[in-house]
Regions:
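Beta1/beta-strand and adjacent pyrophosphate-binding region of the FAD-binding site
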Residues: 1-9
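Glycine-rich FAD pyrophosphate-binding loop
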Residues: 20-41
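Dinucleotide-binding Rossmann-like beta1-alpha1 core, especially the glycine-rich loop
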Residues: 37-131
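Long, low-complexity C-terminal extensions of enzymes
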Residues: 72, 341-470
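Predominantly flavin-linked oxidoreductase catalytic cores and closely associated redox partners
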Residues: 142-276, 332
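Conserved FAD/dinucleotide-binding core of flavoprotein oxidoreductases
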Residues: 247-295, 315-326
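Short FAD-binding loop at a beta-strand-to-alpha-helix junction that anchors the flavin cofactor
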Residues: 303-320
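An active-site-proximal "capping" alpha-helix that borders the catalytic cofactor pocket
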Residues: 324-342, 356
Length: 470
């Protein structure tokens, strides 16, 4: 089959690399417009991105960190979300009891430390400014880490690797027309200098969504009202933690790369328009980059006929928990493992397409609910019905593993649990009650000791030591 990827950016080039590696018998064409620049100033990932980079045979992880100026990401620090001066840490790795039916160590940690930065190995690393890397047999070994990326450098690196692949053809051109048959199947794309036919088209055109119409869009603005982003940069700070600061008109992310902080203020127009003034008053060294509007939501179908929309071409959710790159990778993995086959007929089977769309829709609903829950202390934002039920369950008896969607790529109980407790939806007395009911006190004390031993006995590199050896 001939698979045409339309659009560059991180989603386009990582798609080209993964598809061509895992589906080597197909032909791949990537069409990248020379007129479109990279939007982001900095972006965080989940641990899945590191796993993918490790899997690709022509990418050396240490080289990737060095060339892209990426830094480890061990979690997100949320400031002022449940009130001015409040703070909590949501780690990448989760607690030692994350996979148990009841995450007892999380509740125990909250009774001791409501900031939750002692619930996990990554939390202990944060407190000591250590990285989640060691040197073993002369090579870097990571302990379940994610990354902070410089978007432009990452795109350049992924593109350079893709151009060396024999089964990827790169065309620099701009699409201005799409030709479909009578039932809506795309037959060819017409560019300024090329006419390109294909069997499957992968839409990685981001907000432009050139294969879709406005009628295909499902809005989430009732529960996710943020609709504007102003990006800016700040001076470099040595850090391995994303910061998410709640402000008057929304919230601000700060992502540390090796050379700067990539930042963005996500705001709601209905709450006010003095965004730049608020940025300057909170971050005196801010250098404004650009602003753009958005609407949270998704397409009705990620896979429609022979077009598969990935990343921002399929959805937009404010970048509160690195869901964009994460979902793109989940989509690609599902397509490679369970959907794309040796022939066009087998691949475009209606039941295969339906299976894929249902799974991706469930994930987006999970992500929507999860991002919405962060605003549960802000009366201006309407909670989803699901989140009202989850908060009620939490207060009555805590959350169990099966209370949250357990599907490949979903947020999972680890992220939900830290967020709900970090937002102070429970008291310490509540947590003591739940631990007593679960007979968990002996277990959590033992787990606490084992966690401290692990942290003490492994020679984790400091931030400076890691950067110096790259």
């Amino acid at each position: 089959m001939k698979i045409v990827i339309v659009g560059g950016g991180i989603s386009g080039w990582i798609s080209a690399l993964i598809f061509s590696h895992r589906q080597p018998n197909h032909k791949f064409v990537i069409v990248e417009s020379p007129e479109i620049d990279t939007i982001g100033v900095g972006e965080g990932t989940t641990g899945l991105f590191s796993d993918v980079i490790d899997e690709l045979p022509d990418i050396n992880f240490a080289e990737f960190l060095r060339k892209t100026k990426a830094t480890p990401k061990i979690g997100i620090e949320f400031n002022n979300w449940s009130g001015q001066g409040s703070s909590f840490f949501n780690p990448i790795d989760g607690t030692p009891t994350t996979n148990d039916d009841f995450d007892s160590f999380l509740y125990f940690t909250y009774t001791q430390n409501s900031s939750l930065d002692t619930s996990s190995l990554h939390g202990l690393l944060k407190r000591s400014n250590k990285s989640p890397y060691t040197i073993e047999s002369g090579r870097l070994k990571d302990y379940n880490t994610a990354l902070h990326l410089d978007n432009k450098l990452t795109v350049q690196y992924l593109k350079s690797k893709s151009l060396n692949r024999k089964n990827i053809k790169h065309i620099s051109d701009t699409v201005f027309e799409i030709e479909r048959d009578e039932i809506g199947t795309v037959k060819k794309i017409i560019c300024s200098n090329h006419i390109i036919e294909g069997d499957i088209f992968i839409d990685c055109t981001g907000y432009k969504r050139i294969f879709s119409s406005k009628s295909d869009w499902v809005s989430f603005k009732d529960n996710l009202p943020m609709n504007s982003v102003t990006t800016f940069t700040r001076k470099h700070q040595e850090s391995m933690v994303t910061k998410a600061d709640k402000l008057k008109l929304g919230w601000c992310w700060q992502i540390p790369t090796q050379e700067r902080l990539g930042c963005g203020y996500v705001s709601c127009d209905e709450w006010g328009d003095d965004v730049v003034d608020e940025i300057k008053s909170n971050y005196s060294d801010a250098e404004i980059v650009k602003s753009f509007k958005f609407e949270s939501g998704k397409l009705k179908k990620s896979w429609n006929h022979n077009v598969i929309s990935l990343g921002l071409a399929y959805h937009f959710l404010e970048p509160l928990q690195a869901t964009n790159i994460h979902l793109t990778l989940v989509q690609i993995d599902m397509l490679c493992q369970k959907c794309i086959r040796d022939t066009k007929d087998r691949t475009l089977n209606p039941n295969v397409i339906s299976y894929y769309n249902k799974h991706i829709d469930n994930l987006i609903e999970d992500f929507k609910n999860f991002i919405n829950i962060h605003y549960s202390c802000d009366s201006r934002v309407k909670m989803t019905d699901y989140n009202n039920e989850i908060i009620d369950l939490l207060k009555v008896r805590g959350l169990f593993h099966e209370d949250i969607l357990q599907a490949y790529g979903s947020c999972g109980i680890q992220l939900w649990g830290h967020t709900l407790l970090g937002l102070n939806h429970l008291t310490k007395q509540d947590c003591h009650k739940f631990l007593s009911e679960m007979n968990s006190y002996d277990e959590v004390k033992e787990v606490s000791s084992e966690l401290e031993d692990t942290f003490t006995n492994i020679p984790f590199l400091t931030y400076k030591e890691l950067i110096d050896i790259l």
